[in-house]
Amino acid sequence: MLRKIAFGLAATAMMSSAQAQEVVLKVAHFLPPMSTMHSRFIVPWCDKIEAESKGRMKCQIYPAMQLGGTPPQLLSQVRDGVADIVWTISGYTPGRFPISEVFELPFMTTTHEASARAVWDFIDEHAASEFEGVKRIANWVVGPYVIHLRDKDLKTIEDFRGMKIRAPSRLGNRMLTALGATPVGMPVPQISESLSRGVIDAAIVPWEVVPATKAHELTKFHVEVSGGRSLTTATSIYVMNQKRYDSLPPELKKVIDDNSGREVSAWVAAEFKVGDEGGRAAALGRGNKITEIPADEVKRWKDASQPVVDEWIAEVTSKGHDGRKLYERAVELVEKHSRN
């Protein structure tokens, strides 16, 4: 009898152990598996949490919107539990991140890692409430945005006139308008078709997106700005459903916690830097022309886009915040981490 009881307890323990291993996190995003985010961060991150949980926690990754919907719906999908974790661009849901979008203002960010650390710290200080319902794993900005043009080069601010250019966000729209272009908003997956059909004359995206969108095959000219500041950028968020996180046992929560935060944000930003180098090389490999805008012309662009900054400060202030103080703090954090 005692042997039967012992056997039963052992079987129950084995069943409990097996059940404990069945934590499978659904991770969704909007780019194909060849993209930098998928291959250089999401897959390694998932491998890391699986190893650190000793196989008790794994990921099932759904790239290219395989769970359905469109990129702007990813944030709702993770909040509603359709996905457990998502990567998305905050600018795809205008108005939901009014404070943290400060980093998308013209000529705000510098290097990949420094900007990522600044974004994480700023959100900790001033914008954590924008992430209600989700657990932040990483916040960063993608690399410097480059203008990729179909048929003609762009060298001065006057060349923007009459051009239809894909913009990354509402602040990107405003910047392009200030420079004289006609902005066309769309998620990254729509860029290829829009370029090939002539819906847009150019697209603003970082270099790392180029291979996944075939932008180097659909354009002939690429424009970078000198001076170490990004023309504009997009704030990226890698977040987990809060209830799903709360349901984990303490030891698995610790695995997620150990793989979240400022330095994880810097890690993914560094991978985007590698991706940028690869995208730039792909364009050069096709014989495309890369133009760097000199400092005196960049100053003209910066002066022309200053009203975008002023308008953002006024908008945020009208909602009860100190817009000037928030802007200055974001600048301060970027400069602080750029010095380190």
Please describe what each predicted stretch is.
Residues 4-14:
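Bacterial N-terminal signal peptides
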Residues 14-15, 51:
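Intrinsically disordered, low-complexity segments
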Residues 16-20:
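Sec/Tat signal peptide C-region and signal peptidase I cleavage site
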Residues 21-114, 129-340:
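N-terminal secretory/targeting leader peptides
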Residues 117-125, 129-130:
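Signature of the catalytic double-stranded beta-helix
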